[in-house]
Structures are given as structure tokens and as C-alpha cells.
Amino acid sequence: MAFVSIAPLASRCCVHKSFVSSREVKPLCRTIPTLGRCRRGKTVTPSISMCWTATVLDDGVQRRIANHHSNLWDDSFIQSLSTPYGETSYLERADKLIGEVKEIINSISVEDGELITPLNDLIQRLSIVDNIERLGIDRHFKNEIKSALDYVYSYWNEKGIGCGRESVITDLNSTALGLRTLRLHGYPVSSDVFEQFKEQNGQFACSAIQTEGEIKKVLNLFRASLIAFPGEKVMEEAEIFSTIYLKEALLKIPVCSLSREIAYVLEYGWHMNLPRLEARNYIDVFGQDPIYLTLNMRTQKLIELAKLEFNIFHSLQQEELKHVSRWWKDSGFSQMAYARHRHVEFYTLASCIAIDPQHSSFRLGFTKITYLGTVLDDIYDTFGTMDELELFTAAVKRWHPSAAEGLPEYMKGVYMMFYETVNEMAREAEKCQGRDTLNYARQALEAYIDSYMKEAKWISSGFLPTFEEYLDNGKVSFGYRIGTLQPILTLGIPFPHHILQEIDFPSRLNDLAGSILRLKGDIHSYQAERSRGEESSGISCYMKDNPESTEEDAVTYINAMINRLLKELNWEFLKPHSNVPITSKKHAFDILRAFYHLYKDRDGFSVTRNEIRNLVMTTVIEHVPL
């Protein structure tokens, strides 16, 4: 196991007292008629309570502090976590089950004339692959999955497929599940196959009676529609139709495994879905209803393995989380009153997308660099003065420990921790890549800091840029690039320069991801940021460019833009015959999904008491009952 081991700061740079020693704290609120009003130090809005506080430090400087809620996860609680699932007996049982499940998968390729026939062999293969992937155990069966999908693809044609290779007619369920699964694995499949399932009026043909089979068919159509490429009109039509159908079905059918599956898929879709969260949900869905697989023995083996794998990884998560919490506490960050303390939440996101135990360096690196990025966000957006920000920006570009000496006391520890973390991650990456990658990281960090500096100047001067100018800078300041670049270099996957350029800046994938996340974040953080005097957002800039528009118009425009960009991102990630394998792009794409998940209903960076807290509990703190 390769941990990113970063020692605490040297005593000359570490600040072990409060980073904010205030003489006067005065709450300030801005009155925004369309968004809410202030009451007793809080800005009341429909979605979030937020205001900022003017704080005068011992140095006499008045600063702004956003009233973010404190850390929810006490270090003593984290250090007290324990689980037995790292013991040898559980590991040995899991290894035995892996062998038995491989036998089950291989048995599907053997026709027995009863359960596996030429009339169902395709859907049987697709179903086992789909279930293995959704249960989060697919890393053990890469060869078996490829063999199954190669077989299915060999019978794929311009009309899709039937349930089996000798089926006379094509089947919507098999075709929808087949298109989704094959496309996710890089096979070239066209969405035109769905045209034949539409009636003359353009609507998809479907029985008026919502049986389990009919509902399952439409559910797979919906899942397939979410990985649409640009220009695929039939996929847009499929998404609209299936969304309406499934919502109506939820109102009619009783609460059961199928209804829970529908509710989950409708809520999280694909871009907000996280592999470990899906596995946790699907373990319950899949294990309670045998309709999901033909053989009960197969169901039992898969479920037992999925539960064991979940809990074994859970034991590793707790050890890594203890490391993260100690790092946060020992480094002095716990004393920073002005910053958002979201290290536990960031680790949770990392461990929900990188569920291979071998990727410890990725999880820890992502956690630390994104936490530090959030601290910088709070310094540049609210706490730092313009003179201090200029000093910090210059220090980052100088990149030397001595550069910390000219910084304000509260900045010294932040700078040194950034310096140590980035350098340590570069050393970790060098072990995997066989070359020094520090220059890549420094270039990304400098671009990140420059974008922050530009936004700070906008805030200070009251300047409101055009929408295009704002987004061009905002897609960098979101921090997707610094949160992605160094962590993926520690995965053990080779990233030669020409491959890295297709994922990192200036690639289209990187550009799209940064733009999507910036715009998605603006929709949920706009009100709170405006209450703190931060006028620049995609919504404000759009309204400036279009004086007759309303906030609702701006949100509608931005949502439509996000949907269009997501389709482009799907293409960049999944396009067949690419020079860059999907496996090389997967974690960069999954990092987008992690950030996107934070903005599902609110600004999850700032407010983590609700959905994100539940995510931590269900995927990191609690194990699955066996």
C-alpha cells in the first residue's frame, strides 16, 4: 500500500494557534430583494443560509469571513473507528468467492439447453456484466467481462440485438442494455438502433400495462440515454420518454426492489453517480429480489462477494481516513477559523470513485490537494487582502521554502503545506511514471493561482466581466485540473506526454470538465456568494450581457449549456478508436462525477450537513451487514 506520507510542517512554518485571532467580529449582510433578506446576522435564501463576517485581526486589518459551518468529523471520532473486515479470514473467503463467480460467468458461455439457450445467451451475458459492475466487483473479472462483451458485439447489427443470437426479432431491453454497456467499454455502437422501436407518431412503443418486464425495459432505455453523444436526437427523445414513464411507474407500483432501483437511477443518473455509492445501493436492491438474476445460487454468490468486498475496502478506508484526519490536525489546519474543513468529505469522494485498494496514493493525494485548494479558495475569495494575495501568488511562482518568509503569518503554514504536498505527490508520481512530473504540477498550480488572482481583482474593483470572459477564467479557478493531474499520475497507469495532453490542459476533456463544474457550481452557490459581495458568477455575467433577462432566464440558459457540454464530454470520454484508452481517462472523468455529485442539490462544498454527510456515513463509516 502506497500512502502519500507528508510530514507535519516544520515548527518555523506551522501555526499551532488560531489562524484568526480577532479583536472584533461584526456580522455583515447584504440585502438582496430577489434572493432573501438578512435577519440576526444571516442571509435568508430559499436554499442556503449564508452571510459574511467582518473580522479585525490583531494586525488591525479588516477581513471578510464567510460563515461556513465547522468540521463535522472530530478527529477523536475518526481515530476511534474500527472494523474486523481486514482480518485474514474475510480476505480468504473473498478470494474463494472470486473463483466461484468466475466459474459462474464462464458457465454462461456454455449452453445447457435449459437456462442458457441460443434465444437468451446475449441478454444473459449482458445481465451478468451489468450486475457485476453495479455491485462494484468488476475489477476482479476484466477478462471475463471482455470475453462476454466481445461475444455480444459479434452479433450486434444496425438494428441492435435480440435476447439471443438466434432471436428472430430485436428486443428493446437487450438493445438498450447492450448499447449502454458496449459504449461504456469503447465499442462503436450507434444510437440509430432505437429508431425501430418508435411508432409512427414518434413515440417509443410500449405496453400500456406497466409490468415488471416493461418497466425494466424502459429503465435500461433511460440508462442508455444518459450517455448520449452530441447530435443524437433519438437519445434525447429516449430520455424524455423514459423519464416520464418511470416517474409515473413510481406512483403506481408498490415499494420494492425495482421501485428503489428506479428512484436511485432517476436521482443520480450517470454523471452524479459514484461507483461505491451505487454498489452500496445495489447490494440492497439486488439482494432482495431474485428477478435480477435467473439462478438463485448465482445471486447468493454475487451478493456475498459484493458485501465482503465492500467491507474489506471499508477497513482500508478507515485506516486511510485516520491518516487524513491526523494530517489535518497535526498540520495546524484545524485552527483555521476562516476556512471550510472538508477533508473527510473529499476523502469520501475519492474513495467512492477509486475503489481499487491499490489506489491509496490517488485517494490520499486527491483528498489533500482538493482540501488545500478549498483553503486557497477561502483566502482568495474572502479572507486575504489584495496586497497579501499578490505576495502569495508571487511565492507560489517562486516555489521555494524561503518564499514563505515574506508572507503574513496565517499564510505561511498554508504555503508550506502546499509546497510539501505538491512536491511529495510529484515524488510519488515519479515512481509510477519513471520521470519527473513536478513541472506539470507547477504549471497547473500557477494557472490556478493566476485565475484566483484575477477573480480577486474583479471582486476588489467591482468589475463584472462578460459571460465568455468569466467562464474562460472560471473553468480554471474551479480547480478541476489541480484536483486531477497529480492524483491520476499515481495510479500506476503510464501517462506519456502525448497521452497526458489528451487528458490534462489543453485537452478538450479538461476544458469541458472545468466549464461544466464551474457552471454547475454557480447555479447552487450564486446566492450565497452574492451575499458576500462576490458579484462575478455565470448568472450575473449572463444577465449583464443580456440586460432584459432574469435570474430564471440565466439559470435556464446555463442548464441547457451544461446539458450540451455533458454530451460533448461523453464523446471525449467514450469515443471509439481514440488514441487514449478509456481506462486512461476513467479516473479523470470520475473526478468530474465526484465534484458534480457535490452540486446535486446545493453547494456541497460549503454545506455538507445533509446529503454529503449521509454519503460519508453510508460509504465510509458504516459497514454492510453480512
Curated annotation (Swiss-Prot):
Residues bound to Mg(2+) 1 are 377, 381
Q: How is the cofactor bound?
A: Binds 3 Mg(2+) or Mn(2+) ions per subunit.
Q: In which pathway does it act?
A: Terpene metabolism; oleoresin biosynthesis
Query: What's the top EC group for this one?
Result: lyase
Please tell me where Mg(2+) 3 binds in this chain: 529
Q: An example Gene Ontology cellular component term from the record? A: chloroplast
Query: What is catalyzed by this enzyme?
Result: (2E)-geranyl diphosphate + H2O = (R)-linalool + diphosphate
- Which subcellular locations apply to this protein? Plastid, Chloroplast
Supply the name of the protein: (R)-linalool synthase 2, chloroplastic
Organism ancestry: Eukaryota, Viridiplantae, Streptophyta, Embryophyta, Tracheophyta
